[in-house]
Amino acid sequence: MKVDPSEFELEFFEEIGFERKRCPECGEYFWGPPEAEVCNETPCVEYSFIGDPPASVKLDVWEAGEEFFRFFERHDHEVLDRYPVVARWRDDIHLTIASIACFQPWVTSGEVPPPANPLVINQPCIRLNDIDNVGRTGRHFTLFHMGGHHAFNNHPHDRRDIYWKEETVRLCYEFTVEKLGIPEEKIAFKESWWEGGGNAGPCFEVVVDGLELATLVFMQYEQVGGEYRELPQKIVDTGYGIERYAWITTGEPTAYDAVFGDLVDATARDLGVEIDGEAREILGELARVAGLMDVETESDLRVLRNRVARRLDLDVNELVRVAEPVEFVYGILDHARCLAFMLGDGVVPSNAGEGYLARLVIRRALRLLDGLDAEREYLLEVVERVLEDLRGTYPELAEREEYIQDALECEIDRYTRALKRGKKEVRKRLEEKGELSFEDLVELYDSHGIPPEVAREIAEDEGVEVEVPDDFYSRVAERHEGPEEVEEGLEELERIAVEEELPETELAFYDDEKRLEFKAEVIGTYEVNGDAWVVLDRTYFYPEGGGQEADRGTMRWKDGEAEVKDVQKVRGVVFHRIDGDVPPEGAEVECEVDGERRMRLTRNHTATHVILEAARRVLGDHVWQAGAHKSTDEARLDVTHHRRISDEELREIERLANEIVMKDLPVNKRFMDRNEAERRYGFELYQGGVVPGREIRVVEIEGWNVQACAGTHCDSTGEIGPIKIVGRERIQDGVERIRFAAGEAALERIWETEDLLRETCEVLRVNPENLPKTVKRFFEEWKEQRKRIERLERELVEAKLRAAPAEGRRVGDFTVTLVELEDVEVGSVAGTVEELVKEHENLVLVAKIVSNGSCQVVVGSGESAPPAGELMREIGKLIEGGGGGDERLAQGGGRNPDGLTEDRLVEIVEDLAGG
C-alpha cells in the first residue's frame, strides 16, 4: 500500500532536527540527522557495532530487560509479568509469538479492558519459522524477549487518549539515545507499513549501525473488502528486541555470545569445540555478512561462507571446519533455552499441537549433538545450566526442572528408538518408490521421527540421492503453527441465526441449575435437513458444549407436544431439535428438562474437574487437559503426559478424587471480569479450553481446582457421589485418556464388574479369592497345549513340503510344485524349502501361505532350475505384490492369492527355462 508521507511527519523529529531522507541504496524513506546519507539498515550498511559497541553502557540480556522496565515504569507504564509461552488464552495459535499476542483477541477487539493502560511487558516469545538459521547467522533465535510498551487509545472500556505517534517515538529515542548512550547520529527511524490479523498501520523500524532494534507499529486501520477503514480505537504496538539491545551494547561477535555469555565457552569446552581468537574473528565476520543477505538456502549459506573466506583470505573449507562446530554450540544453547520455557510452561512433547513443536526443537538439538559426535544425554546438562542461568529472573522454570529433565529423557529415548525403527521404513519406501520426495521426508519425520538428514544418509547408502531443503524444519514448523480447524456441522443453524437476526437466548439455567420446569415463548421454528428446530426467548435446557452432551426433555403447548432430542448454541442463539408436533411462532410452551439425565451429566462434569486436579497433583503440574467428553454413562478426560500412567498412579488419582468427594467441598460458580479472573487464578483457568467474552464463568472447587467453564455443576463435591476410574489408554503420543464414571453411573460400573467376577467364578467353580490362582493354572495348561498343537502343525507342514517333490508336475527337466498353506510361520517354511532344493537340483518348489485375504510366498529353486529371485518377480505380478531374493531362495507377498495357481506357475517356469 502507498502510504501518505504525512503519516510519518512528527513534531518530535523537527524538535531534534531529524529530516526525512530517501536511502540511495534501497530507495526507502527514513528519518535521521542532517548528516545521515543512508537508512542505516542492512544490506545498505554492514553491522558496524561488532567489536565497537556504540552504547555508553554494557548490558547482558537480563540487565537490558531491567533497564527497559525501569525506563518505562518511570514514564508511568504499569509493569506486567510475562505471559506463558504457550498461548492458552487463544485458539488460533499454539505459541506466544509477540508481546501484542498477549492481548489478542479480547483486548485489541475492544471486548475486554486492557489489564493496564499504558503497560510495559518483557515477553518471552517463540517463533520457529527461522529455526534452520539459528546458530549460523549470528542473530536468529527460536526464543527471544520482545519488550513491548502498549497504549490502547479510545478503548471502549477506557476512552482516554493515552499517547500516539509523537510520544511513542520520543520514548524510543530517549531510551535508546539518552538512556543507553547511543549517539543520535547512529539512529534512524525507517518508514514502513504493517499488516496482520485484519488490522494495519504505519510503523517505524528503529535501526542502529545496521541492526534493527525495535519496531513501532501504529494500529489504526482495519482491512474490509480490500479497503482500509479507520479504527475507533488506536493501539500502540511496539516490539523491542531485548537480545539485540544486549548485542549492540556489548559488541560481541554474535548475539549468542551476548546472550549466553560464559555458557558458550563452558558448552564448547565440554563438547571439544575450540573457540579461539581466529574462531571469534570468523564468527563476527559471518554475522556481519549474514546481515547483508537472507540466508534461507544451502546455496545462500555457501555464498555467505565464500564471501567471508575471501574477506579473511581463508580457504572456505578451513572456515567451515572452524565455524560450523561453534554454530552447532550456539544452536544447542538456543534450543535448550527454548525448551526450558516450553517445558517449564507445561508443554508435553507429542505428535500434535504445541507438543509437536517442542519435539521438533528437541530433535533438532539432538541432531546438532549428533553432528558433534556428542552423547545425546548431554542435552540434559545444557538445559540444567540454562535453567540455573534463568533462575534469577524466572524462578518458576527452575522449580519445574524435575519434569523438564524427565520429559527430555523420555524424548531422547524415543528419538533413539525411532532412528532404529525408522531405517527399515526408509529402505521400504525406497524399494517401493525408488526416491524420497519432500512430502516423503515430512511423513517420515512426522510419523516415524526420522530426521531428513538421516533419511538422506540411508538413501545415499542405497545409491539414491535425496535433496533436503535447507529450511526443512522451518517449513514443517509452519505447518503446525496453529490448531487444525474442526468442522462443527452447524453451518445451517449459524446461517439462520445471522439471516434472521435472531436475538441471543437467555441462558436461564445459570440462574438456577436445579430448576427443570419452565415456560418460554417461541421466537421461531426452522427446518434443517428434515429436522425441526425451535428457538425460545429463554431456556433451562443446557446446549451441547465444553464436552458436555446436551439436555433432553419435553415441550408442551396448547395444541401439541414434542420431545427435545438435542440442543445447540450458535452465535448466542439456542436451537432445540424436537421430535413430534411443531409449535407456532409466538406460542407459550411449557418445558421440562430430563432431570435424571441432567444430574448424571452434571455429576460427570464436576467429577472431570476433580479428576483433572487429582491427575495434576499425582503426575505433575505440566498436566493439561487436551480434551474431555461427558455423557450419562461415563466421562473421559484426555491429559497431556510424557509417560504412560501406571496402575499405582491411576489408583492414587482415584483415591484423591474420592477423598475430595468425601470432603464435600463447596463448588462456587460465578461470572467474573476476565482480567480479574486471570490475575487471581492465572491461565490455568483455561484448562477446559478458550472461553470468549469480557466476563467468563468461573467454577471453583474451594481449595482444589479453578476453571473457566460454562457447563452445569454440582453445588458441592459431595453431590458427585463415588468416582470410579474404569479405564485408561494412550490415544496419541503424549496424551493419556482416563475414563471414569460418577454417582449412579459409578455404581453401575462397579456392579458390572462384580457380575462379571461372579459369573467367571461360577464357570470355573471357584471362590473369588481363588480366582487368580485358578486362572493362572488354566493359562499355563493352555500354553502347554498350544505348544503341542504348534509342534504338530509344524510337523504336518514339513511333511506336506517333503512330499511335494514326488507329487510335482514335470516341466521339461524340472519338477514344479505349488504347496498351498494357511496361517503358518514363514520362517519355518523357508527353512524346509531351502533344504529341499539343495537336495533336488531340478526342483522348483513354491509355498503359498494365505492369511486374511492376502498371501506370502516362498520360492525355492534347485541348482539347475530357473533362479528363485526371477521366479518371485514374475509371481509378484500375479499376486499384485512383489518380492525378491537370490538364485536359490526368494520371498514376497501380495494381496491377490488367487492369482497364483499351479498352471500359472508352470507357465512362468516354461518361459524362464525357454529364455
UniProtKB/Swiss-Prot annotation:
It comes from Methanopyrus kandleri (strain AV19 / DSM 6324 / JCM 9639 / NBRC 100938). GO terms for cellular component: cytoplasm. This is Alanine--tRNA ligase. Belongs to the class-II aminoacyl-tRNA synthetase family. InterPro entries: aa-tRNA-synth_II/BPL/LPL, Ala-tRNA-lgiase_IIc, Ala-tRNA-ligase_IIc_anticod-bd, Ala-tRNA-synth_IIc_core, Ala-tRNA-synth_IIc_N, Ala-tRNA_lgiase_arc, Ala-tRNA_ligase, Thr/Ala-tRNA-synth_IIc_edit. GO terms for molecular function: alanine-tRNA ligase activity; aminoacyl-tRNA deacylase activity; ATP binding; tRNA binding; zinc ion binding. Catalyzes the attachment of alanine to tRNA(Ala) in a two-step reaction: alanine is first activated by ATP to form Ala-AMP and then transferred to the acceptor end of tRNA(Ala). Also edits incorrectly charged Ser-tRNA(Ala) and Gly-tRNA(Ala) via its editing domain. It catalyses: tRNA(Ala) + L-alanine + ATP = L-alanyl-tRNA(Ala) + AMP + diphosphate. Its EC number is 6.1.1.7. PROSITE patterns: AA_TRNA_LIGASE_II_ALA (PS50860). It comes from the Archaea. The lineage of its organism: Archaea, Methanobacteriati, Methanobacteriota, Methanomada group, Methanopyri. Its cofactor is Zn(2+). Binds 1 zinc ion per subunit. Its main location: cytoplasm. Residues 882-901 are annotated as: Disordered. The gene is alaS. Consists of three domains; the N-terminal catalytic domain, the editing domain and the C-terminal C-Ala domain. The editing domain removes incorrectly charged amino acids, while the C-Ala domain, along with tRNA(Ala), serves as a bridge to cooperatively bring together the editing and aminoacylation centers thus stimulating deacylation of misacylated tRNAs. It is found in: Cytoplasm. Keywords: Aminoacyl-tRNA synthetase, ATP-binding, Cytoplasm, Ligase, Metal-binding, Nucleotide-binding, Protein biosynthesis, RNA-binding, tRNA-binding, Zinc. Zn(2+) binds at residues 605, 609, 709, 713. GO terms for biological process: alanyl-tRNA aminoacylation.
